[in-house]
Amino acid sequence: MKFTQRLSLRVRLTLIFLILASVTWLLSSFVAWKQTTDNVDELFDTQLMLFAKRLSTLDLNEINAADRMAQTPNKLKHGHVDDDALTFAIFTHDGRMVLNDGDNGEDIPYSYQREGFADGQLVGDKDQWRFVWMTSPDGKYRIVVGQEWEYREDMALAIVAGQLIPWLVALPVMLIIMMVLLGRELAPLNKLALALRMRDPDSEKPLNATGVPSEVRPLVESLNQLFARTHAMMVRERRFTSDAAHELRSPLTALKVQTEVAQLSDDDPQARKKALLQLHSGIDRATRLVDQLLTLSRLDSLDNLQDVAEIPLEDLLQSSVMDIYHTAQQAKIDVRLTLNVQGIKRTGQPLLLSLLVRNLLDNAVRYSPQGSVVDVTLNADNFIVRDNGPGVTPEALARIGERFYRPPGQTATGSGLGLSIVQRIAKLHGMNVEFGNAEQGGFEAKVSW
């Protein structure tokens, strides 16, 4: 098996064809030999019987054996006679030979018991013969006609060989033609392999499937789809890396400035304390940004969800509201949960769905003014998170969800990744996210299924 795996497709197909052709030829030879020998036996047995009947119609009382048993030449002017093809002898009932063909007939042993077809041997000869014994109508004579088995076998072999040897001779020609045709048919695959070797790693150009066999075309199409996905992923990763580097530069620069301020404030405890507090706040923002970057990177690499389960959405929303409640109270914001339906369940990854709801609530609390309310409403086919903030402009609304995008004029801290994470998690779960300005005022996010 390992040896055949190292062979080329052309060689393997040629070997398969050669093996199948050889097996077919052998089976055909066996079947032809069997049928031919049966037909030859039937034909010559009939010939023996007819010749014996013709001899039995002679006037055997008038036969002069001395005049008729002289040998005749086997080679004539325009042909050749095989002395094994046919022989005969005529005996009296007491076993005295009165006539034979002058060749092998004189060596046929007499048998007074046999009648019909029987196998036997000549006197002094080990070769097998086929005999037919018959008694004359008057009962005075015994007639025997014989033929050597080897003659029949040679005849059958000659017939079979005449039919099958031309096919055996044609087999090498067929192999050569097959290898040439395979080489021509596999040429598009060789071009395809060359194109793959010369291809740039980040190229999105699809492979040319012209001339490719239909059996291989799905592979080429799958490769083109893979190249497109790989290119899109590389573009996304490059943009992500560039945006991440840009977003991290500002908080890191701010941390450096606050560190320098703290170092220069040894004589002013109040200024030093303020600088350390701002440094701590900057570290928190940088930590949050890094966490969101890592989360988004992991989500981008996911194609299928693992460890999924049936999740009651009312329990998910209640636990998420309880998690954000303390932070909302510190910001003097009230969070209200309204369950218009009960028993709604969704199949998904619990941690990711919890992260989706938490990001929506965190975004609503972060951008809502003090004294406002964040409403969370569960319906039969969606849930809505709505705040009482100022909302966003139509221009900004069109870009909501883009990575690192924050509407202009925002005073609250943020990285612009929270809603991107929400969209990615929703897509993995087959959900749809819509952002818009609420009719009652404020910004709302609707997650539907």
Curated annotation (Swiss-Prot):
Where, subcellularly, is it found? Cell inner membrane
Its record classes its membrane topology as: Multi-pass membrane protein
One term under GO cellular component: plasma membrane
Question: What InterPro entries does the annotation carry?
Answer: 2CSK_N, HATPase_C_sf, His_kinase_dom, HisK_dim/P_dom, HisK_dim/P_sf, Sig_transdc_His_kin-like_C, TCS_sensor_his_kinase
Q: Keywords on this record?
A: ATP-binding, Cell inner membrane, Cell membrane, Kinase, Membrane, Nucleotide-binding, Phosphoprotein, Transferase, Transmembrane, Transmembrane helix, Two-component regulatory system
Q: What class of enzyme is it?
A: transferase
What parts of the sequence cross the membrane? 13-33, 157-177
Record's Pfam families?
2CSK_N, HATPase_c, HisKA
- Catalytic activity entry: ATP + protein L-histidine = ADP + protein N-phospho-L-histidine
Q: Tell me its EC number(s), please.
A: 2.7.13.3
Q: Which residues lie on this side of the membrane: Periplasmic?
A: 34-156
Q: Which residues, renumbered to this chain, carry the PTM Phosphohistidine? A: 246
Its predominant location is membrane
Topological domain spans for side Cytoplasmic: 1-12, 178-449
Q: Name one GO molecular function term.
A: ATP binding
Which segments constitute the Histidine kinase domain? 243-449
Function (record text): Member of a two-component regulatory system QseB/QseC. Activates the flagella regulon by activating transcription of FlhDC. May activate QseB by phosphorylation.
> What is the protein's given name?
Sensor protein QseC
